[in-house]
Amino acid sequence: MNLTLHQPRPSDYEALASWVPDAVACLRWAGPRILFPFPVSELPDLLVVPGGTSYFLAEGCGVPCGFGQHWVIVAGSVHLGRIIVSPAARGKGVGRALCELLIGEAVRCTGANAITLRVYRDNAVAVSLYSSLGFLPVEADSDKEAIFMRVGVNTSIERADSSCA
């Protein structure tokens, strides 16, 4: 499977919207700032994070199959967020590919020496994936619903070679 990251195109947002079936899924994916149902035409603006960059993962034919963002919260560390894989692509290694490419791009673009993310405790598939990529829980920064996870760049996967926004 040939998967690549690219900057968002307007048609990508239509695919992304179809991956979010209800208000609960929307809240868990995007947080409280994006209310369901959301107008697809407003998604590019709704997803803006100051200093952040959005990416779509696409199959060789250009069909979007994943989405993720990165932004800097603390100097020296880059945070990954709003990671989602198309329901049709789940269980096929697409989440791993998305995370590996997103990590590489985030580190390359920011020069960070650590990567962080948050994941719902009950999302066993995602917790397992992130753990397999070297992320470790930071309980001091976690809460009853979500685990804050961190990995150093030297212990993470190899960086992707593509261009920053």
Predicted features along the sequence, with ranges:
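Conserved beta-strand-loop-alpha-helix junction that forms the acyl-donor binding cleft
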Residues: 87, 116-127, 143-147
